[in-house]
C-alpha cells in the first residue's frame, strides 16, 4: 500500500490570476492498496457525504489515467481518502484529488513517470496548472502554457504565516467564472501587471512589506468580491491588524492573508466577516515547500 499527502493550494495568488499558486501546510491523504473487490473506496473527513464511491470518483479517475498511460488496467484496488481540504472553497480540492490519484498510482506502480509527466497529466485533467502545480511540486509556483506545453518556475517560499479564512458557504469555480467580464479597461490590466511584478519581487527579495500592494488584484477580485459579503472591509481590517497582504484564494470564497504573525489578523478577519453575517473558519498555517511527490509514505504532520 502507498499513502500520499497532498497540500491544499491557493491559486490566483493576489494579482497572479491563472498564473501563481502556493501550497499550504494542511493536507488531504490518499491511500492506495490491493482489495479482494474490483474497487473499494472509503472517504472520511470534509465533504465525505458529497464524494462518490464509484468509478466517477475524481481520485480514481486520476488513478486510471496513470494505469492507461502505462498500458495497464486498474483491478482489485482499495482507495482510502481522508480530506481536510474543503470542497468548493478556493483551496484546490479538485487539484488535490487529481494530484493525489496520479501520485498514488504512480508510486503504487513503482514510480515509472517523472514529475513533469505527472504535471502534464494533472493539467490535462484539471484544465489549467495553477493549482495542480503547487499541489504536486510544493512551494510557490508560476505556471502557464507555451502553446500546448506546461511551463513552470518555483519561487522562493515566503517566510510568513498564512491566515486562511474559510466562509461557511460554497462557491463553485464555474459559477464564479460567470461573473467575470469578457474585457477589462486597459488601465486596469496595466495596474495588474504592476502589482504582480511587486508580488514576485517581494517574494524573491523577501521584502514582504511590498505585499501591501503586491497582493492587490484588478482582474478578478473586483467582480468575484460581489459574491462575498464584506470582502473589501475584511481586507482593510486585516491590513490594519498587521497583514502584509490579503486576497481571495482561488475563485473564493476563502480569503488568505500573509503576515509575520497571524493571530491578530485572524481575529480581525473573523470579526469583520461576522459583522456581515458570515461565519468563517480560521486556519493558521504556513506555505508548504514540499508537494505530493515529496510526501509519499511520509511520517510527520499527516497520518501516512
From Swiss-Prot:
Extract one GO BP annotation from the record. Answer: threonine biosynthetic process
Keyword Secreted included in the entry's annotation: no
Molecular function per GO? ATP binding; homoserine kinase activity
Q: Which UniProt keywords apply?
A: Amino-acid biosynthesis, ATP-binding, Cytoplasm, Kinase, Nucleotide-binding, Threonine biosynthesis, Transferase
Output this protein's name.
Answer: Homoserine kinase
- What EC class is this? transferase
Family that this chain belongs to: Belongs to the GHMP kinase family. Homoserine kinase subfamily.
Question: What GO cellular component entries does it have?
Answer: cytoplasm
EC annotation from Swiss-Prot or TrEMBL: 2.7.1.39
Q: Where mainly found?
A: cytoplasm
The protein's job, in short, is:
Catalyzes the ATP-dependent phosphorylation of L-homoserine to L-homoserine phosphate.
Q: Give the SUPFAM superfamilies listed for this entry.
A: GHMP Kinase, C-terminal domain (SSF55060), Ribosomal protein S5 domain 2-like (SSF54211)
Q: Which reaction does it catalyse?
A: L-homoserine + ATP = O-phospho-L-homoserine + ADP + H(+)
User: What lineage does UniProt assign to this protein's organism?
Assistant: Bacteria, Bacillati, Bacillota, Clostridia, Thermoanaerobacterales
Instruction: Give the species.
Output: Carboxydothermus hydrogenoformans (strain ATCC BAA-161 / DSM 6008 / Z-2901)
Location in the cell reads: Cytoplasm
- List positions binding ATP: 86-96
Encoding gene, per UniProt annotation? thrB
Q: Which domain of life is it from?
A: Bacteria
Pathway membership, UniProt: Amino-acid biosynthesis; L-threonine biosynthesis; L-threonine from L-aspartate: step 4/5
| Cross-referenced InterPro entries | GHMP_kinase_C_dom (IPR013750), GHMP_kinase_C_sf (IPR036554), GHMP_kinase_N_dom (IPR006204), GHMP_knse_ATP-bd_CS (IPR006203), Homoserine_kinase (IPR000870), Ribosomal_Su5_D2-typ_SF (IPR020568), Ribsml_uS5_D2-typ_fold_subgr (IPR014721)
**Which Pfam families does this chain map to?**
GHMP_kinases_C, GHMP_kinases_N
